Amino acid sequence: WDEYKVSDAKAGEGFTIDADKVNGDVRVSAKFEADGTEEYKLRFADEFDGKDYSLPDAGVWHNCTRESPTWKRFTSQTAEGQQKTAFIRDGKLVTRCIKNTIAEEGDVEMISGAIESSDKMYFTYGRVEGRLRTTPHVGNFPAFWLMPQDNSAGWPNAGEIDIWEQIDTENKTYHTVHTHCTHDLHLALPNSGSTHTNAADYHVITLDWTPTLLTWYVDGTKAFSYAKTKQSFLLERGQWPYDKPFYLILNQSVGNGSWAKNCDVNFEYETLFDYVRLYQKDGEGDITSAVKDVKTSGSALDVYAQQGGLLLVAPEAQKADVYSISGTRVLSGLVQGNRFVSLTKGVYVVAGKKIVVK
């Protein structure tokens, strides 16, 4: 390979390679580093990097209650059930819905995992991003979504934002809002969009939430948007309740035939969440969180090559990206303290520096 490096490239600039120097494939790699001037800054992140089979961070999450709505009807309520249906494994949050074998869970066919950040981490506006995958099967009904911290107006008046849903065996993602205007009055439609994917693969699902617009992306490609109307008739009927704090919910549920089909009691449903992150612009909205002052720049990150991998050391929470020499990102996450990353032999790039792993 011949390499042509462009440093400090600015938006709109181009780079040309002479045709007579190209013989075969051309590989283009881009690396973007935070410099403090980026539009969106990381405000909150959970990388789910706790010990295997530990529970999600209690400073941010708690288990959802079991209630009558379809998605909540099987939610685990015992410590044993919660341990089996929402736990950390291999740097992922594992949410499951499985056959109920625990007498203390009561007379329910299945038990399901569902966690939420209400009263602990809630925010107004920003970019919410999650990397996730699910296991398509008849009755599958997982979700990554937002509900209002103040729900005194009740559902759907107070609003709901479904960042991502998938049902049954469909290779499709759904992105939806629910309000009094859309659900009860059937106005201000369409309120939902979808895009085709391979549901069994990991995808990065993103929601951009501004005072006037909701925009969904799947793997960086715009999938759907929903705007605040300027019609007083619709605003008076609750078309836009999205100007106050919402919290996160991550869950693996199953259908009852109303949308997703009836569940397969003998199947183990599973959805994995690799990470959840919140970015905001300076001065944009508020965030209340048990995790404060996450820094993305100006904090030291030391990197050491060791046998079989890299040691990353950061006194303060610092976002780290590790790339192979070909430009493939092999790690992206927060580092605080000491973190060893197992890697195969080769050359890697961290914070703009090449490091050899032997």
State the predicted function of each range.
Residues 1-3, 216-218, 322-327:
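Conserved aromatic beta-strand anchor motif in extracellular beta-sandwich/beta-rich domains
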Residues 23-25, 125, 200-202, 345-347:
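Extracellular Ig-like/FN3 beta-sandwich strand-entry sites
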Residues 35-287:
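GH16 jelly-roll
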Residues 14-24, 339-344:
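Solvent-exposed segments in extracellular or luminal domains encompassing
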Residues 10, 27-42, 280-299:
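Low-complexity, Pro/Thr/Ser/Gly/Ala-rich linker/spacer regions in secreted
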Residues 292-358:
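C-terminal outer-membrane/trafficking sorting elements
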Residues 1-16:
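Surface-exposed interfaces of beta-sheet-rich extracellular modules
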Residues 8, 83-88, 301-305, 333:
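Short, exposed beta-strand/loop patches in secreted or surface proteins that constitute
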